[in-house]
């Protein structure tokens, strides 16, 4: 058997296996069986480490196979059998480095927000009407991505621009793991294209800012003094017509200490608008605190792919060349039309992989 003792990673893996066994014993104990809350917590804890345990078992199986093959080789006389054993040994030894890397990634500290829903804010930046059109394109892109994932979208607030553009929009994406997939989308997105209104065919550059915030699920995650809130109600706006709300159902909440303002007029009920606006406010306050903590960690590690800097130009969408380039990881993908239709998993997977590699590098220093 290959000696794994003294290697920090494998000591940690043995701890995880011991914890896994302990949790499974707890799960069938009378105390846990009689308490549904404890049972849920226990199952959740087991699910969080099951993949690590299974991957580690697979790793140890290959280690045992290698030892068995080497021992068999010592006593084997038949040349054909020796050749076959050599092939099996080579195959098993090639598996180990890949499994080790997978185990290292699985042992990285989990982002406690990864399973949460997200609130996404998109604002048109430099470029006037063209920036508003681009903001609308990004909203459609994330909406289509959510559809592909079978996630649900709820609008919180929206300000329309000219030509079917969006000055800004805030919306919730409801789905397990939404934050884990979308957290690297925060930043400045840039578009290069010829506007429909441009007679000379000159390429314009416009921007839109995206912020992805983990939604606050538990009100206890953020403490807010009611005295710090200014709540206004007003009549919902809109494009006019039969759906204009003639009552003061829209809600605007101002958090006086920070100056953060949120509003919601999407629902017909003032109570529902207030609930949505309050959740948006709590999420923004939670994100402020998270960003403060992140900036300390990420500045120490000098991570290239972060989740907090909204001023960072992260990506360019070039229409003439039909390409999208993420500047943080220097990755260019093509098929721009499909990308804007929500086919963005290739980019997201690359960002996650790059971030994991950076975390691994930082943890080994």
From Swiss-Prot:
Keywords: Cytoplasm, Methylation, Protein biosynthesis
UniProt xrefs under PROSITE patterns: RF_PROK_I
SUPFAM superfamilies: Release factor
This protein's encoding gene: prfA
PTM summary: Methylated by PrmC. Methylation increases the termination efficiency of RF1.
SMART domains: PCRF
Function: Peptide chain release factor 1 directs the termination of translation in response to the peptide chain termination codons UAG and UAA.
Gene Ontology cellular component list: cytoplasm
Gene Ontology molecular-function annotations: translation release factor activity, codon specific
Family stated for the protein in its record: Belongs to the prokaryotic/mitochondrial release factor family.
Subcellular location: Cytoplasm
Record bears the keyword Translocase: no
Record protein name field: Peptide chain release factor 1
Residue list for modification N5-methylglutamine: 242
Native organism: Fusobacterium nucleatum subsp. nucleatum (strain ATCC 25586 / DSM 15643 / BCRC 10681 / CIP 101130 / JCM 8532 / KCTC 2640 / LMG 13131 / VPI 4355)
């Amino acid at each position: 058997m290959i000696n794994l003792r003294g290697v920090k990673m494998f000591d940690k893996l043995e701890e995880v296996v011991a914890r896994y066994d302990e949790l499974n014993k707890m799960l069938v104990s009378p105390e846990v069986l009689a308490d549904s809350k404890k049972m849920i917590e226990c199952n959740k804890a087991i699910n969080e480490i099951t993949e690590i345990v299974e991957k580690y078992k697979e790793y140890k199986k290959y280690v045992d196979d290698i030892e068995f093959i080497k021992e068999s080789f010592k006593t084997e006389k038949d040349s054909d059998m020796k050749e076959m054993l050599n092939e099996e040994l080579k195959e098993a030894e090639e598996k180990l480095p890949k499994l080790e890397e997978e185990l290292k990634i699985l042992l990285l500290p989990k982002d406690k927000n990864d399973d949460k829903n997200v609130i996404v804010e998109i604002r048109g930046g430099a470029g006037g009407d063209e920036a508003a059109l681009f903001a609308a394109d990004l909203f459609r892109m994330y909406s289509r991505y959510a559809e592909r994932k079978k996630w649900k979208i709820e609008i919180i607030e929206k300000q329309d621009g000219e030509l079917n553009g969006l000055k800004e929009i805030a919306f919730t994406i409801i789905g397990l793991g939404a934050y884990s997939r979308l957290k690297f989308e925060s930043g400045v997105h840039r578009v290069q294209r010829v506007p429909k209104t441009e007679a000379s065919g000159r390429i314009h550059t416009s921007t839109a800012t995206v912020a992805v915030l983990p939604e606050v699920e538990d009100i206890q995650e953020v403490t807010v003094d009611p005295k710090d809130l200014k709540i206004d109600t007003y009549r919902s706006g809109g494009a006019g017509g039969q759906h204009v709300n003639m009552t003061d159902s829209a809600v605007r909440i101002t958090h006086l200490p920070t100056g953060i303002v949120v509003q919601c007029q999407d629902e017909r009920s003032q109570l529902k608008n207030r609930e949505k606006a309050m959740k948006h406010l709590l999420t923004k306050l939670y994100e402020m605190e998270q960003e403060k903590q992140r900036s300390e960690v990420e500045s120490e590690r000098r991570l290239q792919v972060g989740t907090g800097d909204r001023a960072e130009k992260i990506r360019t969408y070039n229409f003439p060349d039909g390409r999208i380039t993420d500047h943080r990881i220097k990755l260019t993908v093509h098929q721009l039309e499909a990308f804007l239709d929500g086919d963005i998993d290739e980019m997201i997977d690359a960002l996650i992989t790059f971030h994991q590699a950076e975390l691994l590098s930082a943890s080994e220093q």
